[in-house]
Swiss-Prot record:
Expressed in liver, kidney and at very low levels in colon. Its main location: other. It is a single-pass membrane protein. UDP-glucuronosyltransferase (UGT) that catalyzes phase II biotransformation reactions in which lipophilic substrates are conjugated with glucuronic acid to facilitate their inactivation and excretion from the body. Essential for the elimination and detoxification of drugs, xenobiotics and endogenous compounds. Involved in the glucuronidation of arachidonic acid (AA) and AA-derived eicosanoids including 15-HETE and 20-HETE. Conjugates small planar phenolic molecules such as 4-nitrophenol, 1-naphthol, and 4-methylumbelliferone. SUPFAM superfamilies: UDP-Glycosyltransferase/glycogen phosphorylase. This is UDP-glucuronosyltransferase 1A6. The keyword RNA-binding does not apply. GO terms for molecular function: alpha-glucuronidase activity; glucuronosyltransferase activity. Belongs to the UDP-glycosyltransferase family. It comes from Mus musculus (Mouse). Keywords: Endoplasmic reticulum, Glycoprotein, Glycosyltransferase, Membrane, Microsome, Signal, Transferase, Transmembrane, Transmembrane helix. InterPro entries: UDP-glycosyltransferase, UDP_glucos_trans, UDP_glycos_trans_CS. It is found in: Microsome; Endoplasmic reticulum membrane.
Amino acid sequence: MACLLPAAQTLPAGFLFLVLWASVLGDKLLVVPQDGSHWLSMKEIVEHLSERGHDIMVLVPEVNLLLGESKYYRRKIFSVTYSLEELQTRFRTFGNNHFLPGASLMGPLREYRNNMIVVDMFFSNCQSLLKDSATLSFLRENKFDALFTDPAMPCGVILAEYLNLPSVYLFRGFPCSLEHMLGQSPSPVSYVPRFYTKFSDHMTFPQRLANFIVNILENYLYYCLYSKYEIIASDLLKRDVSLPSLHQNSLWLLRYDFVFEYPRPVMPNMIFLGGINCKKKGKLTQEFEAYVNASGEHGIVVFSLGSMVSEIPEKKAMEIAEALGRIPQTVLWRYTGTRPSNLAKNTILVKWLPQNDLLGHPKTRAFITHSGSHGIYEGICNGVPMVMMPLFGDQMDNAKRMETRGAGVTLNVLEMTADDLENALKTVINNKSYKENIMRLSSLHKDRPIEPLDLAVFWVEYVMRHKGAPHLRPAAHDLTWYQYHSLDVIGFLLAIVLTVVFIVFKCCAYGCRKCFGGKGRVKKSHKSKTH
């Protein structure tokens, strides 16, 4: 140790700490991500783990959107059957289909078919990976300590079982209430609204009835989405597999915060990381700083419908542009489509914007969003009231939650007019209650003992240190469906009650025959003698 002292005197203490910390840790983590926006939060955790000295390998399809090279991790590339053009076309079609005429009329059926455009491609991706013997052999030889994945598309779940690795899931939500169904978390239909319903946790009788029916249909939806994965998992593992059985020894990192979500029962292996994507406000570039400064006392409005929507129909884009031109604020609109011909001087189109940094600026008055969870949490973190235009997935439910809390106004983007958008913007900007409500949510959200990113890193390291977290696993996983609902106990007790009732009935019947049956026969014989 003494030989290190001269060198140590010339190095910053922080650097020495990192070096020593890396030598203590250095576990090997295999990451199986989902491409697209799901990767953004996972990437933050991966980079932080890498900075703490862990050896990170990310399993990446050769054709992808966001899974690029990084100094924080190594990539293992595997081949897929689709091209970059097909990948981009599928995502673009998925986003733009929500603006088709009548998109809201078919409701769940159209949404399901539209989702399958992307889901089928992810399944093809998984199929290619699990049939790639060279990649599987490489992964076996590397002897990782844990696997980190997004279980929305369960390829990583299957791989964890194949490699016999403890797993950590990062998840936000998916149809079928996947995390609660597979995590054996109680989910009462009386006050826990189901996915796509747009209900709050205070439901009317008709809403509870609809919620009950949707809960039953979720099992069918689960089968439609995931039955194919059970086939390829059974083929790989050489035994019959049901996906629920593969989720038993896992830790769930859920991007939830009950400031935003409705309160509900949870399990001890569920850790909450809502707002993990929120960062401290950074300094704006010269370009955006100039836009903000030029807005004057009226300030700015930030407008983004996310990366999935690249083009809006011309008529709808012009309606939006007309509404934006009627407010005194400067509008920064992230939009890559054709420029509306009626775009007003106060509206600036940009292909990209530093959303969190702009939302954190004191001159920001409102946020027009598609209600994706990343954007919603950034709005909460920075205390900006919202005008929400949900398009697909959990966005309708997200918008309902914020509307219920009085922090925003929801519009149907397909049916709204320029007047509707103008009125919504003026409402959230001029009505002080919206700003007060979102600031209250922001204060509650930030009042926590540890930052979500640090909490996520702790639990991933926890699983690597202890080779899993089986002590947090609920025993519900070991029960059959009838044992879980105590139907065998109810049946046994019911049988006892029925047996006792039957015996009592028989005894009473026997007693009645003894008491009254004999007298009847005596009277009858007496009458016969008198005749």
